[in-house]
Design a protein with these regions (language model features):
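Extracytoplasmic/secreted envelope proteins and their assembly/folding machinery
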Residues: 54, 74-78, 105, 188, ...
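Accessory terminal helices/loops
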Residues: 8-27, 219-224, 234-300
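Metallo-beta-lactamase
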Residues: 22-25, 39, 62-64, 70-72, 120-169, 171-172, ...
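Active-site metal-binding motif and surrounding structural segment of the metallo-beta-lactamase
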Residues: 37, 60-64, 72-115
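Divalent metal-coordination and catalytic microenvironments
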Residues: 43, 57, 67, 81, ...
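Positively charged n-region of N-terminal signal peptides that target proteins for export
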Residues: 1-4
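Conserved beta-strand hairpin/beta-sheet module of binuclear metal-dependent hydrolase folds
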Residues: 36-80, 177-179, 183-189
Length: 300
């Protein structure tokens, strides 16, 4: 493997192992699952298994992937990558610490270079409780070897892959990965297509932070960019705008109720207008979303 020359600041990573988030994605145990490969460009594919979406850049210099799904999917993911050129990625970017995006680190980590934001490594070394579960720290070879605080780039197969930190949205370690020349962007779990997102308040996530991050992305992304979400189908800027509108509008409903002195139970009982029914049909149901928003705006 060619020598990697990058500026690094020692980093951090962590994952929740039996849980995921997204339609039909919250299954951590070993089972029969098919990894679907969806062509995005000539040398970028989106792979869908059981957890978060995986992006794969292919070419003569090796494969780079963004996220690596659950450990139960690793063998099938490796087989799908082999069909694209190599069963073992040269580089792996983790968009955040949750296990449905990172458990595959343990399968690939002895041969692949794992890269993530510094907070990801920290979370992996000491995972917080999530959905009432405490997971074990990641083994050393499953931790990011290279970390950063703001951004970094890798150049491979004629493409610049630029990772940019977006603070305190889905978690406190979220990265958006840009395939600059191809105009393809992996947004990790800052983006759930047509569904309410999971915002991990206990891992530094915050609904207002997510709103701010998505607003920034909408302003800066090219109109014709191809967007790979953390969960859901391949998307575009209009999909991101619609998602952002849903988050902003429902967050305001909760904020207005809080200002009126309503309790969380009262807010849940009131619910949301019918037009948000589809958004609450995924992993994050409407009641859970209302609680996430309430907790975010209650935090001091």
């Amino acid at each position: 493997m060619k020598k990697l020359i990058v500026s690094v600041i020692i980093a951090s990573f962590s994952s929740f192992s039996a849980l995921g988030h997204g339609d039909n994605s919250h299954y951590g145990s070993k089972q029969d699952v098919t990894v679907k490969t969806i062509k995005v460009t000539d040398n970028i594919n989106m792979l869908q298994g059981r957890g978060g979406n995986v992006a794969a850049l292919t070419g003569p210099e090796g494969i780079l992937i963004v996220d690596d799904d659950y450990k139960a999917v690793s063998e099938r993911l490796s087989a799908a990558l082999k069909d694209l050129g190599s069963a073992t990625p040269k580089f792996i970017f983790n968009t955040h610490w949750h296990g449905d995006h990172t458990e595959g680190n343990a399968f690939f980590g002895k041969q692949s270079i794992i890269v993530a934001h510094t907070n990801v490594r920290k979370r992996m070394m000491d995972p917080p409780i999530i959905f009432g579960q405490k997971t074990a720290p990641y083994v050393s070879y499953a931790l990011p070897m290279i970390t950063y605080t703001e951004s970094m780039s890798i150049n491979l197969n004629g493409e610049e892959i630029k990772a940019v930190y977006y603070p305190n949205g889905h978690t406190d370690g979220d990265t958006v990965v840009y395939f600059v020349k191809a105009n393809v962007v992996h947004l990790g779990d800052d983006f759930f297509v047509r569904r309410f997102p999971f915002v991990d308040v206990d891992s530094g996530g915050n609904v207002q932070g997510l709103i701010n991050n998505i607003a920034s992305l909408i302003k800066t992304l090219p109109a014709d960019a191809k967007l790979i979400p953390g969960h859901g189908p391949l998307a575009n800027l209009d999909d991101l705008k619609s998602y952002n509108q849903t988050i902003v509008e429902t967050a305001k409903i909760v904020q207005d109720a809080m200002k009126a002195g309503k309790t969380l139970d009262e807010i849940k009982k009131a619910g949301l207008p019918e037009k948000y029914k589809e958004a609450g049909s995924g992993f994050i149901k409407t009641d859970m979303w209302l609680e996430i928003v309430y907790r975010s705006y209650s935090a001091k």
